[in-house]
A protein has these predicted regions:
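Active-site-proximal, structured, solvent-exposed surfaces of multi-pass membrane proteins
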Residues: 1-188
């Protein structure tokens, strides 16, 4: 299956604006790695008494994704939270043999669009004894590039009568040829 971060990025890149006889991809902007300070890659172990805290710089105006690589396989159900940018997300691993067990060891956790240049991120163990990770990285893309792509799409003739609000999408989408229509519905 496609990596969650790449899936999101691919969906944004798949948005199409019809041009004169061609189709152009609406750019989502370049995916960028941000600078992480305050933790060593060898110290990525969560226990009940030890959280992982670090700072990320260069965040303002960017959608932030935390990538954790190589999560250890726990011997019991283990859950941890990720807090940063005013959001808290939780992630759970089940032990092998459990119905909820997954081979996915590299979660990608979205933390929204940052209003500040510097973010403090904290991982805390909620359930279980311990979980460790091989490494982490923080990726982002500039939200202004995404907004410019959305604005271009909203001006496209085939979307002229489409409107949306916080709870829905209304209107009709017309196309000169048959094919796929991709909709990305944001949620928080």
């Amino acid at each position: 299956s496609l990596d969650p971060l790449l899936r999101q990025y691919a969906m944004l890149s798949a948005m199409v604006v019809e041009g004169t006889g061609t189709a152009e991809s609406a750019s989502a902007g370049a995916l960028e790695r941000l600078s992480v300070t305050g933790t060593q890659q060898s110290e990525l172990i969560l226990t009940k008494k030890k959280s992982i805290q670090f700072s990320v710089s260069g965040c303002k105006g960017k959608e932030i994704y935390l990538r954790l690589y190589g999560a250890s396989v726990p011997d019991q159900t283990t859950e941890f939270s990720v807090s940063g940018n005013g959001k808290t997300r939780s992630y759970r691993y089940a032990p092998k043999g459990d119905l909820m067990y997954s081979e996915q060891r590299d979660p990608c956790i979205q933390l929204g669009v940052a209003g500040n240049d510097e973010l403090e991120i904290e991982l805390t163990l909620l359930r279980g004894r311990e979980i460790s990770f091989d490494s982490l990285e923080v990726c982002s893309y500039d939200i202004s590039d995404y907004e410019a792509s959305v604005a271009a799409l909203q001006q496209a003739p085939h979307l002229a009568d489409v409107s949306y609000d916080e709870n829905g999408l209304r209107g009709s989408i017309s196309s000169q040829t048959g094919g796929w229509v991709f909709l990305s519905l944001p949620y928080d």
